[in-house]
Amino acid sequence: MVLLSILRILFLCELVLFMEHRAQMAEGGQSSIALLAEAPTLPLIEELLEESPGEQPRKPRLLGHSLRYMLELYRRSADSHGHPRENRTIGATMVRLVKPLTNVARPHRGTWHIQILGFPLRPNRGLYQLVRATVVYRHHLQLTRFNLSCHVEPWVQKNPTNHFPSSEGDSSKPSLMSNAWKEMDITQLVQQRFWNNKGHRILRLRFMCQQQKDSGGLELWHGTSSLDIAFLLLYFNDTHKSIRKAKFLPRGMEEFMERESLLRRTRQADGISAEVTASSSKHSGPENNQCSLHPFQISFRQLGWDHWIIAPPFYTPNYCKGTCLRVLRDGLNSPNHAIIQNLINQLVDQSVPRPSCVPYKYVPISVLMIEANGSILYKEYEGMIAESCTCR
């Protein structure tokens, strides 16, 4: 929790410094490159603090099967910049890979070898909807002297069974990795038996392998990690997204705006045109000073997060900068409030500032990260990359 506290303190300090620098710029009329470097990081810090690990987790030293799987899933779902692909078939906004906690070998019976794998499930707080649950496992194991054919099934301690069904009749399908791996859907099992429980739960699966040749006993499992033979995938959709408000005005306000718009065109056209011309002449060209989108890129290494964020290596939030003139052009898509604020500034009280240049449209970013407990998480964060700007 120390790292999480430090991140929160850094976020607050950065926010205070950003506001102080902004105030100084407004008074002195000077630009600051350092300010531009700080400002785009604020949204990402706020979003990722929720997923930040407590104790310094590290990236896996070896490129294991679980990490390979998630990297392939990420490659198919997002491009190298972290932008979600339009044709992605993942069907969810978040995928968590859960590694097994236990690796208990059961006495073998004949040619059968059994392991009980336990997968921890977090409490269901209603923030995310479980879309799908699958287990990815190796259905062919090639050891030093043995070839094994394997499959998985639910394990119930009170009702053990002596029946070892063949893997030919299961509902598994090929996984994203090699042909030695399969993926089996267990959504119904997880939803019915585990998902409605509020506390911590353990999903136990029985990993069963049949020898293809006569061999010794359990020594064939030595050196085989449980994470190398199976892992759990949980697919979620976010259920607490903000509700978009309808864009309309009361009828009286619409009439007021139409009347004021007509007055502006007839009574103040000359004054406004002169002001726009003077403003354009004062600065080095309206194209360079009017509200517009500016590219900006920062690496997660610069933020000190590269030890737990796997992909993408860079974040391109972009930012909006420029002057919002008294005549708001149509391309800015300014809201009705900005038009009213402009009217107040012109006709009522000039102490009310004109609208500011801010992002208008955003696109999400897909992030692949390692959680504190060692799970690997793919998650799409909405509203992370500015795509266009507006005055409001």
Curated annotation (Swiss-Prot):
Alphabetical list of PANTHER family matching this protein: BONE MORPHOGENETIC PROTEIN 15, TGF-BETA FAMILY
Leader sequence segment: 1-18
Record field: transmembrane: none
InterPro entries: Cystine-knot_cytokine, TGF-b_C, TGF-beta-rel, TGFb_CS
Gene that specifies this protein: BMP15
GO cellular component: endoplasmic reticulum lumen; extracellular space
Modified residues (Phosphoserine): 273
Disease: Ovarian dysgenesis 2: A disorder characterized by lack of spontaneous pubertal development, primary amenorrhea, uterine hypoplasia, and hypergonadotropic hypogonadism as a result of streak gonads. Premature ovarian failure 4: An ovarian disorder defined as the cessation of ovarian function under the age of 40 years. It is characterized by oligomenorrhea or amenorrhea, in the presence of elevated levels of serum gonadotropins and low estradiol.
Impact reported for residue 138 to H: In POF4; leads to marked reduction of mature protein production; does not generate a complete recovery of wild-type activity in granulosa cell line transfected with defective mutant and with equal amount of wild-type protein
Keyword Nucleus: no
Other comments on record: The mature protein migrates in two distinct mature proteins, P16 (16KDa) and P17 (17KDa). Ovarian physiology and fertility are controlled by endocrine and paracrine signals. These act in a species-dependent manner and determine the ovulation quota in different mammalian species. While humans, and mammals such as the cow or red deer, normally ovulate only one egg per cycle, other mammals such as mouse and pig can ovulate in excess of ten per cycle. The mechanisms that regulate the species-specific differences in the number of follicles that go onto ovulate during each reproductive cycle are poorly understood.
Family that this chain belongs to: Belongs to the TGF-beta family.
Subunit structure: Homodimer. But, in contrast to other members of this family, cannot be disulfide-linked.
GO BP term, pick one: female gamete generation
Name of a matching Pfam family: TGF_beta
Protein name per Swiss-Prot or TrEMBL: Bone morphogenetic protein 15
